[in-house]
Amino acid sequence: MTIDLIDFKMTKEGLVLVIKDYDNLEDVVNQLTSKISQMSGFFAAGDKIMLMIENNEKHSHDMPRIISILKKMGIEVSQILMGVTAKEGINVRGRMKMVEEGETKSGTKVVKKNLRSGQALVHSGDVIVIGNVHSGAEIMAGGSIVVFGNVKGILRAGLNESDSIVAALSMEPSLIQISEYILREAGSYDEPVVVHVKQNKIVIESAKDVKFQ
C-alpha cells in the first residue's frame, strides 16, 4: 500500500507543503511531481509556499533537491518550517525565512549580504556568501560553501557531493555538516580556514596550510 507523503495545508499565513517522514527520497519526488501536476491549475508561476518536512533534521540533506524541484515547477519556497502536523493544523516550533537575493552563475549561488538569525539559504550547487553568517542563520548547499566573512551559524555542505568543502575568513559555527559527517563543536578561528573531510571525519585547517587527500 502506498503511503501519502505529500499534503498541502492552508494556514492563516498561507499555503504549507507538508512532507511526512520518509525513507526514500525518490518516493517523495515522484509523489510531489504527481501532486503538483494534478494541481497545475491551482498554481501560477512564481507562487510562494511554506515548506515543512517532518523530522527535518534527518532529511536536511534532501532540502536543496526538493526546493530545486519546486522551483523548476514554478513554485518558490518562502519559509522552511520546523514542526509537526496535528488534527487542528500545524504546530510550528521554528521557522527560517528563505534568502531570495543573489544570482546563480554556472551552478554557483552568489549572495552579497549578511545572513541574519532566522534566515536560510538553500541551493543545490555551490554557495558563495560575501558577508557574515550570524548565529541562528543556516546555509544548506549541495556543493561547497565559501563565506567571505565570519560564520557563527549552521553550515551544511556536500549534501550532493561528498568531496565538498567549507571555507570562511573566520568562524565559530554552531554546527558544520559535510555529506553525512557532522561536527557540533568546531571551536573558534580568527583566521581564514578550510573545513573538509579527511579519513572519515571533519577537520578544520588554516587556509595557508590545508592539504587535501
Curated annotation (Swiss-Prot):
Key words of the record: Cell cycle, Cell division, Septation
An annotated GO BP: cell morphogenesis
Alphabetized InterPro entries for the sequence: CAP/MinC_C, MinC, MinC_C_sf, MinC_N, Septum_form_inhib_MinC_C
Pfam families in UniProt: MinC_C, MinC_N
Cell division among keywords: yes
SUPFAM superfamilies per record: Cell-division inhibitor MinC, C-terminal domain, Cell-division inhibitor MinC, N-terminal domain
Protein family according to the UniProt entry: Belongs to the MinC family.
Its job: Cell division inhibitor that blocks the formation of polar Z ring septums. Rapidly oscillates between the poles of the cell to destabilize FtsZ filaments that have formed before they mature into polar Z rings. Prevents FtsZ polymerization.
Subunit structure: Interacts with MinD and FtsZ.
HAMAP family from the UniProt entry: MinC
NCBIfam families assigned: minC, PRK13992.1
Protein name, entry field: Probable septum site-determining protein MinC
Gene: minC
